[in-house]
Amino acid sequence: MSAKTLYDKLFDSHVVREENGAALIYIDRHLVHEVTSPQAFEGLKMAGRKLWRVNSVLAVPDHNVPTTDRSHGIADPISRLQVETLDQNCRDFGVTEFRMGDVRQGIVHVMGPEQGATLPGMTVVCGDSHTSTHGAFGALAHGIGTSEVEHVMATQCLVQKKSKAMQIRVEGQLGPGVTAKDVALAIIGKIGTAGGTGYAIEFAGSAIRSLSMEGRMTLCNMAIEAGARAGMVAVDDVTINYVKGRPYAPKPEQWDAAVAYWRTLHSDEGAKFDAVVEIKAEDIEPQVTWGTSPEMVTAINSIVPDPSKESDPTKRSGMERALQYMGLQPNTPISDIPIDKVFIGSCTNSRIEDLRAAAAVAKGKHVAPNVKLAMVVPGSGLVKAQAEQEGLDKIFKEAGFEWREPGCSMCLAMNADRLEPGERCASTSNRNFEGRQGAGGRTHLVSPGMAAAAAVAGHFIDVRQLLN
């Protein structure tokens, strides 16, 4: 039998049938939130259809939920309608939903793994581009469009073309203060936001194996920002130990059989990839984006690049436009860039490990006077409860950070948390596009430690200086 990649194994084991170069694949887990599901539920109602497999669906409101006082509900009428519609649809169709006020409520890509609803070997879909997060478990996970959401609800299947396979190997040991977020940004800086287009990426190598599940989720979350369809990491003891005992994990009598299968979920020796990228872990430093695309990124001790030195005219004009939007001058040291707001949260970096890293930097310090708002938004009610049990909320509050309720928050301008025009934000989210965090807002993507460091310094600063 020929050697297979992890992607081959996951894709091939879910093919129902193939014709004309496309495959009908079976979907094991369907995660749902309030933004991309109402049209799908409406379509089912109009056609008189039921959900094909209701126990495969798990729903949670996240994009529109307020992160401040929830006792008065949701102020914005459109946001409120989306969340209420999800509640009603879940009641009508018998779907399990973790509603606002439930401690399990949170960002869909934090909630799924936390509940053990994401398991190795699964196909996982959600009407959300950052579904690639779940690939950290040795699963095939990707975002789908709203019409596909309805298709999966009705048939449990999806028509897919098989992607090419790329392996990104990160060998060596990451330095202190260098995180999975820095690895993700460094990779995107190297291959570009189109570097992974048409590929499913497997992240491998000793540096990846040494990451926690939280770190692996951060990395796979950003695979989509490299243009990839999916990101994934092979199963090992770290994966299995994380899943064990979670509410949706296999029960004790099925556990050994599940683990035996999960241990096969890695690329075989000699498996052929369509592309291989190699990066040395020691070369990666804390990263900061300077432009309006995740590929516009550099190390903290570097400078804002000069478009006049770029020979490609298309790239040059893109850089010029980005610098104009961001209000930055070429050759400015990154550490000289002052900030107005700090956002620690999102499906990229709102898990307990992320909050611990930020708290370690903030402890005993205070948010700088020029920073108007520094906010910490846990990824779920359970993450929030654990952080409070560990006293992290006290560290943040004493340092002048706001401690919020779980949700997508300032990752995107779809709720009350947003930037005003011209405001500059150090953000642990995943996209720095124009207007992503609010019209005219300027986003710099960083790790949680780097965001906390920027909050206390009032400008970007090498987090390693504060950790020494």
UniProtKB/Swiss-Prot annotation:
[4Fe-4S] cluster binds at residues 347, 408, 411. It holds the Pfam family Aconitase. SUPFAM superfamilies: Aconitase iron-sulfur domain. Its EC number is 4.2.1.33. Its cofactor is [4Fe-4S] cluster. Catalyzes the isomerization between 2-isopropylmalate and 3-isopropylmalate, via the formation of 2-isopropylmaleate. Keywords: 4Fe-4S, Amino-acid biosynthesis, Branched-chain amino acid biosynthesis, Iron, Iron-sulfur, Leucine biosynthesis, Lyase, Metal-binding. GO terms for molecular function: 3-isopropylmalate dehydratase activity; 4 iron, 4 sulfur cluster binding; metal ion binding. It catalyses: (2R,3S)-3-isopropylmalate = (2S)-2-isopropylmalate. The gene is leuC. The keyword 4Fe-4S applies. Heterodimer of LeuC and LeuD. Pathway: Amino-acid biosynthesis; L-leucine biosynthesis; L-leucine from 3-methyl-2-oxobutanoate: step 2/4. This is 3-isopropylmalate dehydratase large subunit. GO terms for biological process: L-leucine biosynthetic process. Belongs to the aconitase/IPM isomerase family. LeuC type 1 subfamily. Binds 1 [4Fe-4S] cluster per subunit.
